[in-house]
């Protein structure tokens, strides 16, 4: 396996843009030593509930927490909801050829002579001349005729359709409530391990009403997870500022966005989402097809390297690998290459214009002071609020964050530049002194946040 040379621990220490890798069948079969190297090179992991049983989720999270305990290094765990998508019902493979007339029917299953779709919302949404996209956009079908429970379309490309494949209508959102019933059941099934889940990612959210519904469900089930909102439809982009403000983390889901917008428009949409998130100081990730060729190749293409470099240079908090690590042949090489590329990007990211208030100004002042002194920033925080505020201003050095709350430590691990440390302490003064004793060997600017409007800052030159 061809992978970048170098000490992966050094790579991890220098990465300010965080790395998230999706766990799946490919990571399940890594040898113990390979899994350790793999997790050394990421800051968080993602598990897609659309492709993982409750037992698989439990197995993967246990492996991460075992590593975390052995290394004393917190990692964020993200579970990704399937969302209210429309998918093909049960069917034998259907080989569609370009120019062929294809029929969709309202049905749970098919003998392979038509495409079964067990959801009326699909047939309500589709109109004549619409374009139906399947297989990540590789299969395009132009709608020629519709009925209340059937649709005819002409294939504009070829492909093989199997059960469970997603169906997208170009430029349209389905009128389906969020969370979907499947998501409710999935969250109930994994609720026994809810304390190990740091973020729940919402798919196909269109408004803050959708986000609030998921938050209410999480509260009802006893989850304390933060909510990441995936921006992946035109409806979400149209409500972008609203969605960004009601989320804890924003994700540019490029795969689905590419189905709703022309591929030539995708870079513009991506930049808009990133800039809006930075404006409101919300952590922002970009996901999907970053190193896609590494599903079958031990090295990325030059175009992929340039894409990762350019995307990171926009100032994102994290980059998420999906199929590259979940089902690809070279998961360890993929995270190694991601780290290697990011090493050349960090210090070229400009400061981002952000909304200002007094607490923002305090955080910005800390960042500027540390930068002028060539110092690290040390923060002791109970909730992580000040640490996140500091990260908004994109410090150029590592920010060590001590916290007595392991959940806070885990959630901060995928925020720009933050290096969380679990430090038990009864109060802020004790916690900051413990942090300084661990990480205060070089010039530093240290603080423990805001209590009643009073700031305490220590500087070592």
From Swiss-Prot:
Optimum temperature is higher than 98 degrees Celsius. Thermostable for 2 hours up to 100 degrees Celsius. It catalyses: pyruvate + ATP = phosphoenolpyruvate + ADP + H(+). ATP binds at residues 48-51, 87, 165. Keywords: ATP-binding, Glycolysis, Kinase, Magnesium, Metal-binding, Nucleotide-binding, Potassium, Pyruvate, Transferase. GO terms for molecular function: ATP binding; kinase activity; magnesium ion binding; potassium ion binding; pyruvate kinase activity. Pathway: Carbohydrate degradation; glycolysis; pyruvate from D-glyceraldehyde 3-phosphate: step 5/5. Not activated by classical allosteric effectors. Optimum pH is 6.0. GO terms for cellular component: cytoplasm. Its cofactor is a divalent metal cation. The record marks 230 as: Transition state stabilizer. Its EC number is 2.7.1.40. K(+) binds at residues 48, 80. This is Pyruvate kinase. It comes from Pyrobaculum aerophilum (strain ATCC 51768 / DSM 7523 / JCM 9630 / CIP 104966 / NBRC 100827 / IM2). The gene is pyk.
């Amino acid at each position: 396996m061809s992978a970048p040379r170098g000490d992966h621990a050094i790579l991890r220490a220098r990465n300010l843009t965080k790395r998230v890798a999706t766990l799946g069948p490919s990571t399940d079969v890594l040898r113990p030593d390979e899994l350790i190297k793999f997790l050394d090179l990421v800051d968080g992991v993602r598990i897609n509930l659309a492709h993982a049983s409750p037992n698989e989720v439990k197995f993967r999270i246990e492996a991460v927490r075992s590593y975390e305990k052995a290394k004393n290094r917190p990692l964020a765990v993200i579970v990704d909801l399937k969302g209210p998508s429309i998918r093909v019902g049960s069917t034998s493979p259907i080989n569609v050829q370009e120019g062929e007339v294809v029929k969709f029917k309202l049905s749970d299953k098919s003998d392979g002579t038509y495409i079964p779709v067990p959801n009326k919302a699909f047939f309500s949404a589709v109109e004549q001349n619409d374009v139906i996209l399947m297989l990540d956009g590789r299969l395009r079908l132009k709608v020629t005729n519709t009925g209340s429970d059937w649709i005819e379309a002409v294939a504009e490309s070829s492909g093989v359709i199997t059960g469970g494949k997603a169906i997208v209508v170009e430029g349209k959102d389905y009128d389906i409530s969020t969370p979907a019933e499947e998501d409710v059941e999935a969250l109930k099934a994994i609720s026994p391990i809810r304390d190990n889940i740091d973020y729940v990612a919402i798919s196909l959210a269109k408004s803050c009403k959708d986000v609030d519904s998921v938050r209410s469900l999480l509260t009802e089930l006893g989850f304390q997870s933060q909510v990441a909102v995936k921006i992946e439809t035109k409806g979400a982009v149209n409500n972008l500022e609203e969605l960004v403000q009601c989320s804890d983390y924003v994700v540019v889901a490029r795969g689905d966005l590419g189905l709703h917008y022309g591929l030539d428009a995708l870079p513009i949409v991506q930049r808009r989402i990133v800039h809006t998130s930075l404006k409101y100081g919300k952590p922002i990730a970009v996901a999907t097809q970053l190193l896609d060729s590494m599903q079958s190749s031990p090295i990325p293409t030059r175009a992929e390297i340039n894409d990762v470099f350019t995307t990171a240079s926009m100032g994102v908090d994290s980059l998420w690998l999906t199929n590259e690590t979940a089902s690809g042949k070279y998961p360890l090489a993929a995270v190694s290459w991601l780290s290697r590329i990011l090493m050349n990007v960090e210090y070229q990211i400009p400061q981002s214009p952000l909304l200002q208030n007094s607490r923002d100004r305090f955080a910005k002042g800390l960042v500027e002071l540390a930068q002028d002194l060539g110092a690290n920033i040390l923060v002791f925080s109970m909730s992580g609020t000040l640490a996140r505020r500091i990260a908004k201003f994109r410090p150029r050095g590592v920010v060590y964050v001590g916290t007595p709350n392991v959940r806070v430590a885990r959630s901060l691990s995928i925020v720009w530049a933050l290096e969380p440390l679990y430090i038990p302490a009864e109060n802020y003064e004790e916690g900051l002194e413990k942090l300084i004793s661990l990480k205060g060997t070089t010039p530093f600017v240290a603080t423990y946040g805001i209590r009643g409007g009073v700031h305490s800052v220590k500087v070592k030159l």
